[in-house]
Amino acid sequence: MTPPPASQKASEKASVYQPSQQGLYFPKPPVFQSVEEERLHRKQRLAAVCRVFARYRYEYGFAGHVTVRDPEFPDRFWTNPFAMDFGRVRVSDLLLVDHAGTVLEGNWAVNQAGFVLHSAIHQHHPHVLASCHMHTANGMAWAALGRPLDPITQTAAGFYNDHAVITEQAGAVVVDREAGQAVAAAFGDNKAVIHQNHGLFTVGRESVDEAAWWFIALERACEIQLKAEATGHPLKLISPEAAAHSAKHLATPMAAWLHFQPIYDAVARTEPDLFD
C-alpha cells in the first residue's frame, strides 16, 4: 500500500513560514473526501510515529503508547499493540479500543496502563485528537525534579504557559481508572505535561503529527536544560514577552505539523512496509 500525498499547495496563509512568493510548493495538511480516507491517514501517521520513536530510541521495553481518535467514532481510539517492537508496527497491527478497554479491532493485547491513562485523557479532553507517552531518558530525568521547564531556548519557549507538572499518582504505575481520571483532570488545557517521577505526555489538537512533534520537542527541551544546568552556571532566561511571542508564532498546531513532515517523509521513504 502506498501512502497518499502528505500535503498539497496552500491556498491561504497557514504559517509564518509560508512564502509570500506565488507558485511555490508549501506543505499543507490534506483535506479528506471520506471518513474512511481520514481513518486510513490517521492510522498511517500513527504507525509512522511508532517507527520514528523507535529510530529515536524512545522505546523502553513494553513501556510507551501512542493514540489517535477514530474520525467516525470519537469514543474509540487507535493505539499500538502491547509489547510489539515500535520498529515493526504496521498499519494493520494497530488496535481499535473503546473507553471500556475492549479491543474492537486487532488481536493483540492493549497496554493496560496505557489504556487507563490515554482513555482518560481522551474522555476528559474532547479537543484532544492524539496523544503520546514514552519512557525517555531525558524526560524521566527531568520528571524526577518535579519542575516545569524554563524558557531558555526557542524550543522550550514553545511550551511557555502551555505545559504543566502533574504530581497526582507520581511514580505509581497507573492501572486503575480512578488514578487515570485524576491524571487526566490535572492535564488541563496544556499540550504537554511532565508527570513527576514518570515521564512526558503530549497531545495534538489537530493531528497525530502535532502530538508526535511536541513529544520530540519536549524530550529535546528536557535534554537541553539538563545539560545547561550541569554546567553549574546560571541560566539566562528568555523574557516573558519574547517567550510568549515565540510560543504564539512557532508553537502552533500547524507549526508542529510542519516540523514533523521531513521526519515522516524519511521514515515513509525508507520503511514502506509500515503502510501494510
Q: Which residues does each predicted region cover?
A:
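A conserved C-terminal secondary-structure "cap"
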Residues: 2-5, 9-49, 189-276
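An anion-binding catalytic pocket shared by soluble metabolic enzymes
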Residues: 32, 36, 43-132, 139-152
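Divalent metal-coordination and catalytic microenvironments
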Residues: 68, 121, 135, 183, ...
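Short, flexible, solvent-exposed loop/turn segments with mixed acidic/basic and small polar residues
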Residues: 93-95, 155-157, 189-193
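A general structural signal for well-ordered alpha-helical packing
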Residues: 118, 139, 180-184, 208, ...
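Class I SAM-dependent methyltransferase SAM-binding "motif I" and its flanking Rossmann-like core
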Residues: 137-179
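A contiguous binding-surface segment within folded domains or other stable secondary-structure elements
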Residues: 165-202
